């Protein structure tokens, strides 16, 4: 018999943490204690869906997003009711499913679904700790102790790391973080802004700067010169692809390219092929030798990201107009250093076949993407204790498909899970809504098994009769 109720502590209360909490509330059917640790007031939103700007749109269609496993149309149904269209208008319902709604609206949906899930479980004890977890230590035979700066420590049977990218928001280049608060008048006065990276974050910053009054030139630096592609005009049915059985990433890349070309020849958008690959990507990734995975990361990742992480058509059109009108310029090269000056920023750029050059800008933003911070105290403490290990590429932590963290010598750490982007190095396709929800659901099912009371043994039953 337990001295205290079975306790699950979810560290991180953005989208990933909300998905983990909702899944546990769905699957763990015994009374338990749920602790959610999140210092931000934007519960359920996180960085991804915390924007309050109505023109910051989701990069996935409404019909494809849901925080509830097995209910793919949940966000669409919720949004339809919010827009007060009445669910009997099937045509409007279908049309809404193909749209890209504001991220703020999705954040509201996640937050509401989280509190609804809590409300449906009067048998649980829910606690919100408005702080970031500082340390997680193992207590032999008693689970884990989660420590905070000021709040009382929490003893937990299960700890789920759901900090998305581990609280790291830039690569430490010296440039501004992508969503760092910059007064609008600074954009209005700026003649040049420089953006390191050419993915979705760059698009947010560039178009946001325009909305805030920036009228000057934008310099976009990209090692491979790739920009995000556009979604198809309407949602496409994912197309199953028979790829060659190969442990070489070059063969797989060729197979994907040929499949996209054949789809287009048959009148099917290439986006259907990319969408069809998503479910099988973790298996494909794990089937590659580490050296081949590293080759993909060095050479092919920018091309994959440009086709996988796409833009709504209207946003893509605005981006293309920036370059067509020469208000923005794409420079292929590698940033070797960023220095703050009295006038702004000096960025050292190395382009192929040229000597290093210095570019000057009034503002410089690191848009190279979020990445896990494996050196933050929380993660470092786990690795030093042998409870966790970085994956082979140091993109995150080594995990099993369910998210159970692998510690020293590849041994699973009982009761310790990571969900979402912290698992990217192991599972690869684990940064988008559907994949995070599926992984959270798998983890919650495993947790439910450990939470269930043990069946009495035959000997105990016989002795009591």
Region roles according to the model:
Residues 80-84, 110:
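Conserved phosphate-binding loops in N-terminal lobes of ATP-dependent enzymes
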Residues 52-76, 236-251, 314-317:
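N-terminal glycine-rich dinucleotide-binding loop that anchors FAD/FMN and/or NAD(P) in oxidoreductases
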Residues 457-465:
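Long, low-complexity, intrinsically disordered segments
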């Amino acid at each position: 018999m337990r001295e205290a109720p079975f306790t699950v502590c979810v560290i991180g209360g953005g989208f990933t943490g909300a998905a983990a909490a909702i899944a546990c509330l769905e699957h763990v059917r015994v009374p338990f204690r749920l602790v959610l640790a999140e210092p931000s007031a934007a519960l359920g939103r996180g960085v991804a869906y915390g924007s309050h700007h109505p023109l910051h749109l989701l990069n996935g269609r409404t019909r494809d997003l849901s925080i509830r496993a097995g209910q793919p149309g949940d966000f669409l149904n919720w949004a339809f009711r919010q827009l007060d269209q009445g669910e009997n208008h099937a045509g409007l319902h279908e049309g809404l499913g193909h749209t890209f709604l504001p991220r703020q609206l999705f954040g509201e949906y996640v937050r509401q679904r989280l509190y609804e899930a809590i409300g449906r479980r009067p048998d649980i004890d829910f606690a919100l700790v408005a702080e970031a977890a500082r340390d997680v230590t193992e207590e032999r035979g008693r689970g884990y102790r989660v420590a905070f700066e000021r709040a009382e420590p929490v003893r937990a049977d299960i700890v789920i790391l759901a900090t998305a990218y581990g609280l790291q928001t830039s690569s430490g280049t010296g440039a501004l973080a992508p969503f760092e608060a910059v007064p609008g008048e600074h954009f209005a006065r700026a003649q040049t802004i420089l953006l390191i990276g050419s993915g979705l974050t760059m698009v947010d910053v560039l178009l946001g700067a325009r909305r805030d009054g920036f009228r000057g030139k934008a310099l976009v630096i990209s090692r491979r010169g790739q920009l995000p592609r556009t979604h198809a005009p309407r949602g496409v049915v994912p197309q199953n692809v028979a790829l060659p059985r190969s442990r070489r990433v070059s063969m797989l890349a060729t197979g994907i390219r040929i499949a996209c070309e054949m789809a287009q020849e048959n009148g099917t958008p290439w986006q259907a092929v990319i969408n069809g690959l998503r479910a099988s990507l973790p298996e494909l990734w794990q089937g590659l030798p580490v050296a081949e995975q590293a080759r993909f990361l060095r050479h092919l990742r920018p091309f994959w990201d440009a086709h996988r992480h796409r833009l709504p058509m209207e946003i893509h059109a605005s981006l293309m107009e920036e370059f067509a009108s020469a208000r923005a310029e794409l420079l292929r090269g590698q940033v070797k250093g960023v220095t703050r000056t009295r006038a702004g920023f000096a960025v050292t750029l190395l382009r192929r076949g040229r000597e290093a050059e210095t570019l000057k800008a009034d503002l410089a933003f690191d848009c190279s993407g979020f990445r896990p911070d494996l050196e933050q105290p929380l993660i470092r403490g786990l690795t030093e204790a042998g409870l966790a290990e970085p994956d082979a590429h140091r993109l995150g932590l080594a995990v099993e498909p369910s998210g159970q963290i692998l510690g020293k010598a590849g041994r699973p750490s009982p009761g310790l899970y990571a969900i979402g982007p912290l698992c990217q190095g192991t599972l690869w396709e684990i940064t988008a809504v559907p994949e995070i929800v599926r992984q959270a659901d798998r983890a919650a099912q495993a947790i439910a098994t450990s939470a269930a009371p043990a069946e009495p043994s035959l000997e105990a039953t016989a002795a009591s009769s």
